[in-house]
Amino acid sequence: MTQQSPYSAAVAEQRHQEWLRFVALLQQAYAEDLHLPLLQLMLTPDEREALGTRVRIIEELLRGEMSQRELKNELGAGIATITRGSNSLKSAPVELRQWLEQTLLNDK
């Protein structure tokens, strides 16, 4: 087993703080109805498309009607991306999973 150096831990903490800063900025942008321009500024068209695909992956995994291979073919996403989504969903807090089910599956 390898140990993280203090530098690695410090870098990881800095990145975590930067992530939290972005989340706070996004919350403020939503409160001021500036979320779309902010996201267009911060994300490339490919990144925005990838996020949309990830939402579809989570939605279809929650629905449970397609295999991961069928989902790969339907969405044109890599099997590794779908597997990561599946693994993330399995480890998600119950409250988040319930909210996602209600939001993504019951709103259609």
Swiss-Prot record:
What does the record give as the DNA-binding region? 68-91
Q: Name the InterPro entries for this protein.
A: Trp_repress, Trp_repress_bac, Trp_repressor/repl_initiator, TrpR-like_sf
Q: Name one GO cellular component term.
A: cytoplasm
Sorted keywords for this record are: Cytoplasm, DNA-binding, Repressor, Transcription, Transcription regulation
GO MF term (any one): sequence-specific DNA binding
Q: Where in the cell is it found?
A: Cytoplasm
Summary of the function given for this chain in its UniProt record: This protein is an aporepressor. When complexed with L-tryptophan it binds the operator region of the trp operon (5'-ACTAGT-'3') and prevents the initiation of transcription. The complex also regulates trp repressor biosynthesis by binding to its regulatory region.
Q: What family does this chain come from, according to its entry? A: Belongs to the TrpR family.
Tell me what this protein is called: Trp operon repressor
Species of provenance: Klebsiella aerogenes
